């Protein structure tokens, strides 16, 4: 991420451990991911307990936060199976791959696109807004993705799955877990 001397790691021991895992397994990314994903810290619940409900710095529980604008738009494209189109970029380009933060996108503007002026996200707010909620409910672009003939949603609703199976499948595709 940002390895400048002016931005020291918050947990240098952890960074050293992960570097050791990476080098000892010949830079096997899957092994590194296994190490991280199987860790106690990664698997912590987002539900705070009485003893850690005010803790927002010690990683005592997962802190729920809104996805960045680019990740949210890419997730909507992934779930619906309908790619976003950006002028001057091939179809299927993901929002996270855009280097030009001036490309017109009402979605990215509404959800607080990264200005890409600094590796720090300290200038952007993760708090949801009414405009964001209304955009998710009423945006014609999202409606077109959902209703597209080739969308995953259309294929699922035209399938022989029961309502319960549809809910399960959509939950797995969007959340990666059962409802």
What name fits each language-model region?
Residues 28-38:
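Alpha-helical secondary-structure segments
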Residues 1-8, 16, 23, 30, ...:
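An acidic, gly/pro-interrupted, aromatic-rich
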